[in-house]
Amino acid sequence: RPPRSTRKESSAASDVYKRQIMHGAKMDAGAVAGVTTVQSPIALARAVMEQSPHVMLASRGAEQFAKEQGIPEVSPKYFETERRKRALESYKARKQAGIEPHVDYKFGTVGVVVLDSKGNLVAGTSTGGMTGKRWGRIGDAPVIGAGTYADNRSCAVSATGHGEYFIRHTVGRDICARMQFAGQSLQAAAEAVIMDELVVAGGDGGIVAVDASGEVSMV
């Protein structure tokens, strides 16, 4: 069940969720986007990975697959919180007043990275997206190599931030590639991408990651 506090209201009346999970052993992955009635979108993402030949399902197709997999269905109102309603109202008021709204990326995304006893690396990311986003917008969370990535040869990464920048710069994959091909440590690779490359591009955000030796990085 997704934490209710992760919900970010869109500028429309209802909202959508994005989830992804990736297993670093065989590069298996499952992702969903644009779902509004699935009680546990991360469970649906795992079902896509394990019970289908696909990597990503979206919108009604994803919700239909959830029904086929027996994943509980709920009303979109199930996810609503007063805090997020207030955040949306504040966003709209600032936009109407011609003030650039501030989006705090430290809240709203749940990320997990795992190194198991067999040496497998797994990453998962769950989010309701950016407050005030355009209806239909999909961010980095369900995009493999952007908001989520796992490879047993390097590391597992889960990210949060301004998704468009994370997609353009393939943040998750870039961190893993720097370790695999440039020989950088996890911390050095993460800092280079988040603190240097992303900042220069005008983006903002952070990551949590773990490598094959168990080193953890939060940047």
At which residue positions do the language-model features occur?
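Residues in well-ordered beta-strands of folded domains
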Residues: 20-22, 113, 158-160, 208
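Zinc-dependent deaminase catalytic domain
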Residues: 106, 114-117, 122-123, 142, ...
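C-terminal binding/interaction regions
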Residues: 15-19, 26-107, 173, 184-219
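Conserved mixed alpha/beta catalytic, RNA-binding, or beta-rich assembly cores of soluble enzyme
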Residues: 127-168, 174-179
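Internal active-site segments that recognize and position negatively charged phosphoryl groups
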Residues: 94-134
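Single conserved hydrophobic/aromatic residue that forms the stacking wall/gate
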Residues: 2-13, 17
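Short, glycine-/Ser/Thr-/acidic-enriched flexible segments
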Residues: 26, 120, 128-129, 162-164, ...
